[in-house]
């Protein structure tokens, strides 16, 4: 008799514990196929996500695409940088160079640099300080500042 009571009690506890939990049943009728997005659909999603103050999650939901996939497409299109939400960096470009025909011309350039007064640049960003002494071209100083700002 105890055995029947224990069984009935166990069954009642099981039903009470799981009551109301299983309301949705999904029937899989065949193999799941990946969705292939056309270039036009991708372009439309990318255009909407490039708008200022665009809600990427809402755009992804509206088109039925995963937000991570949309961000992957945005990164590939250059809309965002390697870190989520970071603006894309400028595309690499060639730097013009000048080839000296004469060795003396090269030595004259080096002598001109050495004759100039030594400069000092202090760069203070985000609580850190960097001091650069000597002659620094404005382009190099600009590149250093932009690189330091990009790490924030």
Swiss-Prot record:
Looking up Pfam families in the UniProt record yields: HTH_Tnp_1
An individual GO BP term: DNA transposition
* Domain of life assignment: Bacteria
Asked if the record carries the keyword Disulfide bond, the reply is no
**Has UniProt tagged this entry with the keyword Transcription regulation?**
no
GO MF annotation, one:
sequence-specific DNA binding
Alphabetically ordered keywords of this record: Plasmid
The record's comment on protein family reads: Belongs to the transposase 8 family.
Q: What is this protein called?
A: Uncharacterized protein y4jB
Source species: Sinorhizobium fredii (strain NBRC 101917 / NGR234)
């Amino acid at each position: 008799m105890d055995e029947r009571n224990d069984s009935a009690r166990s069954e009642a506890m099981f039903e009470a514990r799981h009551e109301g939990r299983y309301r949705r049943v999904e029937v899989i009728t065949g193999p799941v196929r990946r969705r292939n997005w056309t270039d036009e659909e991708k372009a439309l999603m990318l255009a909407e996500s490039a708008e200022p103050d665009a809600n990427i999650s809402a755009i992804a939901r509206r088109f039925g695409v995963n937000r991570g996939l949309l961000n992957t497409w945005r990164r590939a299109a250059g809309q965002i940088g390697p870190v989520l939400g970071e603006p894309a960096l400028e595309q690499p470009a060639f730097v013009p160079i000048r080839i000296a025909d004469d060795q003396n011309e090269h030595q004259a350039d080096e002598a001109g640099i050495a004759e100039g007064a030594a400069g000092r640049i202090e760069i203070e960003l985000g609580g850190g300080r960097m001091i650069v002494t000597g002659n620094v071209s404005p382009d190099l100083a600009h590149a250093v500042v932009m690189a330091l700002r990009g790490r924030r």
